[in-house]
Each structure stands twice: as C-alpha cells, then as structure tokens.
C-alpha cells in the first residue's frame, strides 16, 4: 500500500476521484507486473522488450480516440509481430491495479488505526468456528453463489466503490472488445476469464460477492433483535483482509420490502463462505431455513438479475449430512462417554452423548488430484514423474517433500490421519521411481544403494515440530499428533501443491 502512495499523486486524484489518467502511467504496469498473482502480464518477453511494448501501447492510446486497441486490428499482428491479445492482457492487468486504488486508500488513509487480524485471514480459522457452533445446530444448507448473468452487473457493482465514470466506461469498453459483452456468462467463460486475468477477475467477482453479503448483513441486522456488533465482509484478496463498513442502507434498502424482514428473526442463523460456496446453518425448524432459501433466491433475482432455482438448494439435517467444504468432509457425530456418579451410598452410571464436529480427508478426490498431475494412476498406484527426471536428485526430493508437507500441513485438522499415510506412500514411491528412472535403474536396486536415507526425509511437519517440543515424551507426542491442529498461516488453497 505504501508503494501506491509513493507513486501516485494522491491529493490530486483522490480529491477528484479521477483514476483513468493513470492508464497512461508506465509505473502502473510495473506495479501490475511486480505484484501480479501469476506475473503473466508480459509472459515470454524480456524486460527490454516489455518496456518497449508498454511505451508503444501508451503512445497508441494517446494518438487514438479510444483507449483500447481493437482485437480486430489487422495491422497490429502484421506490423508489430505480437499476439493480438497481448495489449488486452497488459491493459486489463494495469486497469485492475488502478481500480484497486479506492479500496487500498480506505485502508491506508483511514483515520482510525486498523488492526491487522492476520489470524482471521487463514482458511483454517473457519474450522474452530465450525467446531464451536455447528454441534449446537440442527439444519444446514449448501449454497452456491451464482454468477451474474451479464457483465454489466459486475460494472454496476463497482459504481458504488469507484466514482470515476470514465474508468467504468473504460471497463465496459474493455469487456466489450475482448470478452464478448453481448453473450451470457457461463462457467466456461468465467474459467477462461479467471485464467487469462486473475487479478481483474478477482476484483470483479469479489465486488459482486461483497455487495451480495452487504445486503445479507444489512437485512440480517434490520430483522434481528440481537444486533451484530461488528459488520463487514472479508475480501478474498489478501490486500483486502480488513472488515469494511459501508452505508448500504441508502443503496440497497429499496430493493426489498420491509414486510419480508420478520421472517428471519433467528439469532442462531450462521453463515460461512469461502470463494463461491457458502453454508447456512440454523438451530430452528426447517420452516425458517426454507424462508431463508426463498429469501436468497429473491435477493439474487431482484437485485443481481440472476435466475436461480429454489429446488437446487437443499436443506439437510446436520446429524445425517456431510459437508464438502474447503477440502474436508465435515459431519456431526455423537461422542459417547460413560460417567459413574455416586450420591451417599448409591452409585449410578450415566451415558452422556455429546456432538462433535468430525473432519475427514477426502482420500478418493485427493488421489484423483494426484493422478491428474501424474503422481499415480487412477487406482492410486504410484508412477514416476517423467517430466522431473531431468532435474537433480536434490530438486526431485525437495519437490516431493514440499508437496507432501503442504498436504500434511493443510490436513493436520483431520480427525483420522491414517488417510494421509496412503498419500505419503504414493508420493514416497513416486519419488523413488522418478529417481530410479533418472539413474536408469530398478526401484529395488536403487533402494538398496540408497538405504533408508530417503525414507527418513518423509516425516510430517507436525512430527518434526512436536518432537522438538516434547523430545522425551513419546506418549504426549503421539497424543498431540493424533489430535487436530489448525494452522493460522494458510491463506490460499490453490498453492498447496505448487511444486514450481
């Protein structure tokens, strides 16, 4: 955030809310490249030619009446020799940085001190909440947040945050030129958009989800006698991790009549979301859950113009339903305990049944993911990673170790860790087969020559840490390791098996 203040003329642009002139500044594209999610803005070009491309792009934008160079410009590829989508990629990633500035300035220039709740940024911070709340609840519903049906909906969402009309028109023009503005949004289009420009996609999608949750929170506060103390939404982007307050009453209050608010006076309604999947859970009767379901459908249809079928939102009894959320299968199971009590001369035995959140590793989907990246076949039998055979022995072992430690780190909250032993076996044997293939040897011959050194490397991170804390207490170590451990430093699921 400090880099934005150092580069930008904040007083000038913040006073008038003019953002579009920044599209002509070279440092904007440098920031987009240095702080990009995948640094793909100038992929395949060296620094010298990259700077030349940016200068040429800015020069063409100055000379033309419109900002965006048309993808149908026949002379572009013929004269310059570049891919016709390269200019689109550069402008869109630079534009994403520009539109992020109003969000960033609210955090940097806030008069009140911002407390950086790093622990709440972790994905694992959701599970202690589920452990605490869900055993007392009865009904749950898995809800997929639908995409807006037209790109104009995303642009209209940004107008509450970005006051510069020229920037919004530029965004419309960009989407019209390069992403087939007139077509409906499908999952394939969103997938292509997210891959080609993840920064702009996250900005648009998060603003859409943020607005939806602002409405949800506002109506929840209006309808409940137990007002929420803190109000706000967490952004998925790491830069926007703080809770943000915004006057949604003026913007959204007219979209829904006050008569429907009395339906939702439930102090035990809980809402959890990660990315596009959310969970609604309640302690009350299924009738209230049904009312919440139709409320959400009306919210999407009336405000976001998204068609959604109520029949596709299922309400399940929590005691008989397993949640597929954040890579875990979570369910509520009874935990029986026998207590012997004695009063005067009489003793009696009581059975106490307590509900407990059970989190399991989805072993079959996990093996499927390993098979997709060629660590094993579809049946889970390890195979060699042929694309890594040209690397050094140290690099091969280090890559396998990082993958397993990341998986072990993330699934440390599992109630039953025996499933991880199979993943450990697959990765260990795949590593041995890769090394044997590199040295043109058999697995048995290679293991005889190597000994047990390779096997010693495949310890989980939890075992290493706990062995340092409890060097002599083997029973305590085993007890701690068999329990669940939630880490507060995991911010992204997609990088768990990033082996590059």
Curated annotation (Swiss-Prot):
Domain of life the protein comes from: Eukaryota
Lineage, broadest ranks: Eukaryota, Viridiplantae, Streptophyta, Embryophyta, Tracheophyta
Database matches in Pfam families: Intron_maturas2, MatK_N
The species this protein was found in: Prunus laurocerasus (Cherry laurel)
GO biological process per UniProt: mRNA processing; RNA splicing; tRNA processing
Cellular component annotations (GO), alphabetically ordered: chloroplast
HAMAP family on file: MatK (MF_01390)
Signal peptide (residue range): none
Record's protein name: Maturase K
Gene: matK
């Amino acid at each position: 955030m400090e880099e934005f203040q150092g580069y930008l003329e904040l007083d000038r642009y913040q006073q008038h809310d003019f953002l579009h002139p920044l599209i002509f500044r070279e440092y904007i594209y440098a920031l987009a490249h240095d702080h990009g999610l995948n640094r793909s803005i100038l992929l395949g070009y060296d620094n010298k030619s990259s700077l030349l491309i940016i200068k040429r792009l800015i020069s063409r934008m100055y000379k033309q009446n419109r900002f965006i160079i048309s993808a149908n410009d026949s002379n572009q590829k013929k004269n310059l020799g570049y891919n016709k989508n390269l200019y689109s990629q550069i402008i869109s990633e630079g534009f994403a940085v520009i539109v992020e500035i109003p969000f960033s300035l609210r955090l940097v220039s806030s008069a009140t001190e911002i407390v950086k709740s790093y622990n709440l940024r972790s994905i694992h911070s959701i599970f202690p909440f589920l452990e605490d709340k869900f055993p007392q609840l009865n009904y749950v519903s898995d809800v997929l947040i639908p995409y807006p049906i037209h790109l104009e909906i995303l642009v209209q969402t940004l107008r509450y945050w970005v006051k510069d009309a020229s920037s919004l028109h530029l965004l419309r023009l960009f989407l019209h030129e390069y992403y087939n503005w007139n077509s409906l949004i499908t999952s394939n289009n969103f997938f292509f958009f997210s891959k080609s420009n993840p920064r702009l996609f996250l900005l648009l999608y998060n603003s859409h989800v943020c607005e939806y949750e602002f409405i949800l929170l506002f109506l929840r506060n209006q309808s409940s006698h137990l007002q929420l103390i803190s109000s706000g939404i967490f952004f998925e982007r790491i830069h926007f991790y703080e809770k943000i307050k915004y006057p949604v009453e003026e913007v959204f209050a007219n979209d829904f009549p006050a008569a429907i608010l009395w339906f939702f006076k439930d102090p035990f309604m809980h809402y959890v979301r990660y990315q596009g999947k959310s969970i609604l859970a309640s302690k009350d009767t299924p009738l209230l859950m049904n009312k919440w379901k139709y409320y959400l459908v009306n919210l999407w249809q009336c405000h976001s113009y998204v068609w959604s079928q109520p029949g596709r939102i299922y309400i399940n009894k929590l005691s008989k339903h397993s949640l597929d959320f954040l890579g875990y299968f979570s369910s509520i199971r009874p935990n029986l305990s026998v207590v012997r009590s004695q009063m005067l001369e009489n003793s009696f035995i009581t059975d106490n049944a307590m509900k407990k959140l059970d989190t399991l590793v989805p072993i079959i989907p996990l093996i499927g993911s390993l098979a997709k990246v060629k660590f094993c076949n579809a049946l889970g039998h390890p195979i060699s990673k042929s694309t890594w055979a040209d690397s050094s022995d140290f690099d091969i072992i280090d890559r396998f170790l990082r993958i397993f430690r990341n998986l072990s780190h993330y699934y440390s909250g599992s109630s039953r860790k025996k499933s991880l032993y199979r993943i450990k076996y697959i990765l260990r044997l795949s590593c041995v087969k890769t090394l044997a293939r590199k040295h043109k040897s058999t697995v048995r011959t290679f293991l005889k020559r190597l000994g047990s050194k390779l096997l010693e490397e495949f310890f989980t991170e939890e075992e290493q840490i706990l062995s340092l804390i409890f060097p002599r207490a083997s029973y305590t170590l085993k007890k701690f390791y068999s329990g669940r451990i939630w880490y507060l430093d995991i911010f992204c699921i997609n990088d768990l098996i990033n082996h590059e």
